[in-house]
């Protein structure tokens, strides 16, 4: 419809989650109207993040160091690990200011239909941390959808004889993602977590 360069930009923007064709066009036109320096700064920031940000060797959260800021924080409660699917979930929970333990990012959820099995996730790393780090509680904070519930059930079955296993309380919408829940809802869910 437009020039090949604009069509390509729109196509690339639609690859972002939640960005449809109409939004991609708006973003593309905004970037084209913006001063050249502004567009180049955005491109540079994206490139820098892709080059510098990696996964924490301990928990799997995003970091620029070998170990993330949360894992390095001596004030955190090291006896509790909150298990989440993605690094974005860590941010969502941190914004509640209700949780002071550590995290473990699985990198997804079990989904046999999609070919995601336990060995495809950071589950063995979680078991090693529980065994060696003096963990007394694991909070299962996977998404309240089919794959998240299946993952929580799988982990609970394998952990409940070793440590206390809790699940976030209800209040989170079934079928929703933690990333989109507000701080109050997440805070209540954390405070009201239950044994599994």
Regions found by a protein language model. Name each.
Residues 49-52, 64:
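Short metal-coordination and nucleic-acid-contact micro-motifs, chiefly zinc-binding Cys/His arrays
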Residues 24, 72-142:
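Extended interfacial segments that mediate partner engagement and assembly in macromolecular machines
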Residues 63-65, 76:
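Short functional micro-motifs and their immediate structural scaffolds
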Residues 2, 99-100, 127-196:
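Long C-terminal interaction/binding lobes of large macromolecular proteins
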Residues 56-59, 68-71:
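Short cysteine-rich clusters marking metal-coordination/redox-active sites
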Residues 1-17:
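Extended, structured, electrostatic nucleic-acid-contact surfaces
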């Amino acid at each position: 419809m437009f020039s090949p360069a604009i069509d390509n930009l729109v196509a690339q923007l639609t690859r972002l989650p939640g960005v449809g064709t109409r939004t991609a066009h708006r973003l593309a036109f905004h970037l084209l109207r913006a001063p050249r320096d502004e567009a180049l700064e955005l491109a540079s920031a994206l490139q820098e993040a892709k080059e510098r940000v990696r996964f924490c060797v301990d928990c799997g959260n995003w970091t620029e160091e070998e170990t993330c800021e949360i894992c390095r924080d001596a004030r955190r409660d090291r006896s509790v690990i909150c298990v989440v699917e993605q690094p974005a979930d860590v941010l969502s929970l941190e914004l509640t200011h209700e949780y002071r333990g550590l995290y473990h990012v699985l990198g997804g959820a079990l989904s046999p239909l999609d070919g995601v099995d336990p060995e495809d996730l950071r589950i063995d790393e979680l078991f090693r941390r529980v065994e060696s780090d003096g963990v007394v509680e694991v909070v299962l904070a996977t998404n309240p959808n089919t794959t998240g519930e299946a993952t929580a059930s799988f982990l609970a079955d394998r952990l409940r004889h070793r440590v206390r296993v809790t699940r976030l309380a209800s209040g989170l919408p079934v079928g929703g993602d933690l990333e989109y829940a507000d701080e109050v809802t997440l805070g209540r869910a954390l405070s009201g977590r239950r044994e599994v």
